[in-house]
Amino acid sequence: LAVVLCCWAAWSKWASTTRIGLVNFQNYQTASLVKSNEDNFIEYEEIPLDRLDRLGRYDLVLGFGMGLKITEEQRAQILAAADEGTPIYIYAATNPENDICSLDSLTKAGISAYIGNGNKRNYRNMARYVRQHIDAKRLFVTPAEEAVESASDVLYHLDEDLSFKTVADYEKYLREQGIYREKAPKIAIVGGLNDPFSGNRANIDSLIVSLQNAGMNVYPVSSYRQRLAFLREIGPDAVIHFAH
């Protein structure tokens, strides 16, 4: 029995699944995190606000602070779990009372870099970072790569690893792929909450393919600051705008 208990303790400490609890993340955010995870020994789980009493079962509790509305009792539950040793970080808290973090400054900066530059690669490596550096597992660990800056103010296509700073570069790529159609209608796609580099983009890809199959040249734009400049240069025949 003692041997079995020792083996179980060793497994739990060095090899067991890393569990990351998510509090107040929107569905599309959760989907991006989950779909980016490629490690069998890392799991995400959403934590409803009425179940904050079980934060202690997670190896990291990651909360999204924007729009987080909790009662004093719920906030006390989060603080109590942090005091008891559960790693907790409420990211992007807009209410100072919800600015709760039990991570050291370096670990907090690491998590912030991954999630602040949200893309599939960073989300995947954030999960690995949690297992390696916060959960401190020794087995079934894939070393985390450093966070990379997420592409912004760019055009993009079906290959999520590619982005294009100029319309000319994007059209050159389409021609090289045999996709560009001379004198075909131009359709621009802008807006939407889905970051095309977050790993959760099946709906965007489906739209791009459908429009291309219909004989159109498609220009998906991921930009806030230069959106109008891109549209002026593209000169689209129609614009599909995802307001939300």
Could you describe each region identified by the protein language model?
Residues 1-244:
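An N-terminal assembly and electron-transfer interface module characteristic of large anaerobic redox
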